Amino acid sequence: MKFPSPFTPNSIKIMLLGSGELGKEVIIEAQRLGLETIAVDKYENAPAHGVAHRSYVVNMQDKEALLDLIQKENPTYILPEVEAISLEALLEAEEKGFCVIPSAKAVSLTMNRKGIRTFAAEEVGVKTSQYRFVKTLDELRSAAEEIGYPCVIKPVMSSSGHGQSVCRMAEEIEACFEEAKEARGDSSELIVEEFIPFDYEITLLTLNNGKKITFCDPIGHIQKGGDYIFSWQPAQMKKSVLKKAQKIARDVVSALGGRGIFGVELFIKKNEVYFSEVSPRPHDTGMVTLITQNFSEFALHLRAVLGAPLHVERISAGASAAFKSSQESQTPSVTLPKEAYAKDCDFRVFGKPVSHEGRRMAVLLIKDEEAESALKRAKKLIKKVSE
């Protein structure tokens, strides 16, 4: 495989749409391969802006503005890293011959929960929780009665768990409706899901390089308010259950098509596996691979995009812990304790230009002989990180 130098006529250009902490790692890996890198986001000084060859501040939901930038830069690959992007722009760019990763169709289906849930359950035929789509409070009441309490209520379009809640009784319906309505983005619809009292949940990082599908070891994770706070690898599970999980992930990723990494989220209840969601990009819970694998999810993503051979090997057990800000600040900082500099620890400080309550500002990484002990240490150490 040939890697022309950046700024030469035949350079391989990647345009990243969304330049947060995950995108920053993708750009760093692209730089290691000598690719020409362009980072785009809606705000200045986004994390990936500082490591890309060029950066732009653009409203990515503005179809014409985004198309103009794509035409100007003429990227080899367009990598959407967030959901707040004009789908029309991506579809039109693909029609004009640009390569959207993994494809405009896959981005379209996974951009909202209605698209991917309908696709997975009704077209691919994988097992999911019961679900209904609603628009009004009355429709929500009817759907909740039909599915039963408790149930999970989410906007069809939102990210990082925004607007998601568990409704445990009819008296809570209106408050849950208002919470979801506030966060529902470009869609007027909500999804009501059966609450699965799962034993645990995993992310199965699934890679497609156009020739074969490859899996990373399963990643366990804990979420709070729909957003990840801890992850660990490997998640302990029976081989028979892992095979079921891999089959679901393979079926969904094969049906979506395209190259790259897919973060497939699954619920496990006893020996049953339920499909939850899929992201066609590196996954936040996968940051643990920065310390557990020979190649991180970010390096593997790029290799898959390029159609290169993939060699996935876990070299250690480990855990990650997200550090979130508790305050609004125009001059944010992260203070790490001396224990974070131990030989089996690592960290990433994202360098975001401003902080606000709940914004992820850093991640702590720990490796150990067992994932359980790494997680225990991560939970203890993250409490010593401050602003």
From Swiss-Prot:
GO CC terms in record: cytosol
Residues that bind Mg(2+): E265, E277
Binding, N(1)-(5-phospho-beta-D-ribosyl)glycinamide: E21, L22, E81, D284, K352, R359, R360
Assigned keywords, A-Z: ATP-binding, Ligase, Magnesium, Metal-binding, Nucleotide-binding, Purine biosynthesis
Reactions mediated catalytically: N(1)-(5-phospho-beta-D-ribosyl)glycinamide + formate + ATP = N(2)-formyl-N(1)-(5-phospho-beta-D-ribosyl)glycinamide + ADP + phosphate + H(+)
The EC number(s) this enzyme carries: 6.3.1.21
Highest taxon, organism lineage: Bacteria
Domain ATP-grasp stretches: 118-306
MF-aspect GO terms: ATP binding; magnesium ion binding; phosphoribosylglycinamide formyltransferase 2 activity; phosphoribosylglycinamide formyltransferase activity
GO terms under biological process: 'de novo' IMP biosynthetic process
Positions with a binding annotation for ATP: R113, K154, S159, S160, G161, H162, G163, Q164, E193, E194, F195, I196, E201
UniProt pathway: Purine metabolism; IMP biosynthesis via de novo pathway; N(2)-formyl-N(1)-(5-phospho-D-ribosyl)glycinamide from N(1)-(5-phospho-D-ribosyl)glycinamide (formate route): step 1/1
NCBIfam families reported in the protein's UniProt record: PRK09288.1, purT
Subunit annotation: Homodimer.
Family per similarity comment: Belongs to the PurK/PurT family.
Function: Involved in the de novo purine biosynthesis. Catalyzes the transfer of formate to 5-phospho-ribosyl-glycinamide (GAR), producing 5-phospho-ribosyl-N-formylglycinamide (FGAR). Formate is provided by PurU via hydrolysis of 10-formyl-tetrahydrofolate.
Descriptive protein name: Formate-dependent phosphoribosylglycinamide formyltransferase
